[in-house]
């Protein structure tokens, strides 16, 4: 079989095009030639399997290295047919993403059934194969058809269109006998009823014209793939955001579970919501205490937390007394207003161990489990071994394990061998993950059947005490700490403690680590949120001797030399720039009555009229260690004060090149900045703004474009980015180019110098919400800053008179409707904000509804809904109100 590829693509000197072609996992590269640097031709001759599609992408190379390739989730494709002697003439144009890429994602396609393309008989000599992209038809009981001016195309009779086959999701093919057509002919694509075949919609463009295409016997011509558009209003949907642990049902066990998630899907369906967004559900079990409640610090990027198993779907305990005792304890822990992480997890794990003793061997021998194990063994076995060793040694910190501290695949395989004395305990974790897989997959299938988008959350970081850090340490910089610079959430920045990624190593295998992670998630979810998408451009890297985030620097970055700093008019002594500035005035401002105590115990005169920290207190980690266990008010004040002295510097030294510097983030708020005269302050601010808002834009754009196209197109899920905080100008460039949905929050406007965003102006490719899990609810925010609330009430809501002290239901309803009316593709509101519209049902404890406070690094994540899901499903008035709000905003 021969294939001739033709494409127009303008190259520059030294570049060439090739075709990256595959069938049945067999890869081929076809080099292309050109006479003018614009019209390219490539020829291939292979034996191909007739029933499998040939998929291919175009790529640009320079000196043998690929420098660009098509990155869309939908490659070009065609089916070769039955004749191995056929010659395929393929016309193409370069394509990265379809115009409305979101419509091609699994979030908006729930009804695809693969079809084999139509095939002509073996004695047919000349063929034309149309290949079109058109999303969403199957979900509406339609398929793509072709109708045209000649008799073979129905002579424009609306009841005689030719039916096309959906060979891949949203990809439609039709092969015709070229000799049956009258050239030139006009034609259009139409949406036809699945059963009757009647035309229901015509594409919105002038008639297409097919010119005379002389073909030799044995040739099949494939014109360019095109996108087919119909005059449809964009599908905007509404949804609810809530952590799984926050769900409450009559039968749950002190914490929400996957069975409750199915009930939430029922409520979403009842109210007309088509999206459910949750927080990360990965296993975070480290100490077994409430500190494990933080869902972004998991021990595995694949394994789910055992607390999410719905015990109701498992066998009942055979021991009657044990069953009665469990039920009594379950009712008690489930009646608590907040999650008691320790009680709920201990109760559930005790039950799970008993059930494992009852049915573990049977389940582990089942064909379904063995299938699950074969497909997940790569991560499941190390995870189960990690859990066993964590339990055995009493710590998840593998560096402290007396044995197996360095991962060895062969040793771990021997440890996990059936018959080994540890196997029963290790296999317990296989059993748990299998049950979690079965239950979440059932929820996913259930939600899809109702047309509900299930949106997961991918944390940016991994724990340094995790399976991944143990098994694949080469992918990480374990001596660094990831975090975020100061923002509305935290004036000192955030130090998450996660190691940073070794992107150079990850790039070598085309980011396999990330692609595996996304692929696993796609088994259950149709959309996902990339937590801190800015981390794919650059990450805020904090030295391991720091507690706060103020002494961090972006990585990768372009640090400044001393000559560059001087070029901005800033001629200062390097020690003054990089050493903590401490004098008597600073001490009085920071410590007040404790100043003399600080002079005597923590600092020493530096001979320049100021002070230097003693070596035993010259880093924040040393100070933290000194004050460990001292929780009295004076000690806490001293500790925070010493932290602030240590970060009172104008510049921080680059982690890789000690000769280069970074301006310290937000230093204008600190006393060292006040030591500069007005001219020096102006020069510093000029340098600061250039460094943080201009210098890196192109550099960080290129960094993101190395990673994000590969990752976001590796699965069919809808991609949403959490683009809050200190957002460089290049971030929206990339997100628009890759059609990644942005996050829009009215009280965190993207426009500088504005107090509030304007939902009516949000971009279509965005997720609109009132607040995130890191923020107070709308009712909570309403009471935080009366002056700001007053401006919002008068200027944004256009109300007159005195503002209500507490946000009444009618006002909350207005806010909800205002957000629903936004142009955003998704409007996903926190469950608490949905409930705020009903004064009889909403929680009277406003502050208790907050999920997280980012400024508190040891926050207890424990909020649970105050109503049961069964109650919620019975609240007809509330549910009807929500449905009407959604319908009136033209969401569906």
Task: Describe the role of every protein-language-model region.
Residues 2, 8-53, 61-82, 133-183, ...:
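Aromatic-rich carbohydrate-binding modules that target alpha-glucans
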Residues 103-129, 177-180, 209-892:
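Catalytic cores of glycan-processing enzymes that make or break glycosidic bonds
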Residues 80-82, 88-93:
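C2-type phospholipid-binding modules
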Residues 93-99:
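Terminal, intrinsically disordered low-complexity segments enriched in charged/polar
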Residues 32-33, 87, 163-165, 195, ...:
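Intrinsically disordered, low-complexity regions enriched in Ser/Pro/Gly/Gln/His and often acidic
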